[in-house]
């Protein structure tokens, strides 16, 4: 059995992650694929959950990401192309680099739309209050700008 790839599709909210990840999973050249939403792993938390954007959530977020990584590895070992759909900034790539050192094939793709388009797409669909959502989306959009060595991983999605 061939080991599957792990393809991380990331970017700020409103850049098309879920749409693109779904297409990539369905069009994979592997016999099997899985579309994994990182957000789902945060929704599994029932008691004592801390909103992941708050600074005090760091320990919780590490546990959630570790659980997610283990699931992704297991699918890949099972021969699935693993399409990761979530916010994985360069500031949090070390766990993914560790997978490469474990001989997993990992790809990192950043989707980016203009700030105006990103805000238009993301702000209205959030479950957070508008002010908090605007602040979060603006912050995340800025975090995915000027990616230095990862700029070559960016795909522009403003017109898609």
Positions of predicted regions on the chain:
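Phosphate-binding P-loop
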Residues: 1-4
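Hydrophobic anchor at the beta1->P-loop junction of P-loop NTPases
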Residues: 9
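The conserved Walker
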Residues: 13
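Walker A/P-loop
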Residues: 18
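Conserved substrate/cofactor phosphate-moiety recognition/catalytic segment
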Residues: 22-67
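Glycine-rich phosphate-binding loop used to anchor ATP phosphates in small-molecule kinases
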Residues: 59-103
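Conserved phosphate-donor/acceptor-positioning beta-strand/loop module used by diverse small-molecule
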Residues: 102-122
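Small-molecule kinase domains that catalyze NTP-dependent phosphoryl transfer to phosphate-bearing small molecules
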Residues: 124-160
């Amino acid at each position: 059995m061939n080991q599957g790839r792990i393809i991380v599709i990331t970017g700020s909210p409103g850049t098309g992650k879920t749409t693109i990840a779904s297409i990539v999973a369905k069009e994979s050249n592997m016999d099997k694929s899985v579309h994994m939403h990182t957000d789902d792993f945060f929704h599994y938390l029932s008691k004592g959950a801390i909103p992941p954007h708050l600074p005090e959530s760091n320990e919780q977020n590490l546990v959630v990401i570790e659980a997610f990584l283990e699931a992704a590895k297991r699918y890949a070992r099972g021969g699935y192309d693993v399409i990761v759909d979530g916010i994985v900034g360069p500031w949090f790539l070390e766990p993914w680099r560790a997978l490469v050192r474990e001989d997993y094939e990992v790809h990192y793709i950043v989707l980016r739309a203009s700030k105006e388009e990103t805000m238009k797409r993301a702000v209205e669909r959030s479950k957070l209050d508008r002010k908090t959502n605007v602040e979060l989306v603006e912050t995340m959009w800025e975090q995915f700008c000027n990616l230095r060595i990862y700029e070559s991983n960016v795909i522009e999605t403003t017109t898609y």
